[in-house]
Amino acid sequence: MRSSEWIALLYFLYLAIVCWLRPVVLPRRAVITGVSAVLVGVIVFVARSAPVFARDWAPFVYVSVAYYLTGHLFIAPSERLEAWLLKWDHRWFGDPTIRFARWPAWLIAYLDLIYTLCFLLLPGGFAALALTGHSSQANHYWTMVLAADLGAFAPLSVFQTRPPWAIEKPAELAASRLHRLASYVVKNATTGVNTFPSGHVAVTLAVALGVITTLPIAGIVFLVCAASIAIGCVVGRYHYAVDVLAGAALGLGVCALTAAFGA
């Protein structure tokens, strides 16, 4: 099996075990355990029997399922941890809900849009490699991406917090209509909980670094997107600033380890 497949398999085993070690309600435990067992079987089957094309793209399915399944671990927010995270936001930005009110509407619209479409960067990075004849780098790419994203999801079993938008007054931003639309998508199409470190930042940085050594121009574009998402996390109140910094550190660390030990 590829290293990326092992990462996914071990993560689903982790979910199946940790849900019984935390006070998760029984129906959720059943869902987490059952879906995790199915995914372990799927990963093994794909690794052994699926065509190379399917195997190359399957990690995007694994990480997507893992994201929503991890959300089932959420029990109750740690208000003490939330207060600590907010303290740093207020120390650095004053009142972050009004700090960016004077930023131009086009910039706010761009940040909201790139944040909302973050999930497209994961297959987008591999598509850039595959379409330029570098599909052989699938395992290297997905090892970085899965390790970064799942590494951000895993601590949710312990560090349980709500995103800033769930506990603050609405942010005052110039592009209010688009921000309301982006907020609606975030509230209704995501798990609605906060990941510490930020999965958005960790994984998009991994996407960029997974592409840049082979396709420098494309990698720079993805790097700009990753930086924009990091800024958008704080401006749109989707993440705390500490989440963003921790996510960047995680993404860099994962990519450094992958480069050092190979994939």
Provide a role label for each language-model segment.
Residues 192-203:
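Membrane-interface micro-motifs in multi-pass membrane enzymes
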Residues 1-191, 205, 209-224, 228-231, ...:
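Terminal transmembrane helix and immediately flanking juxtamembrane interfaces
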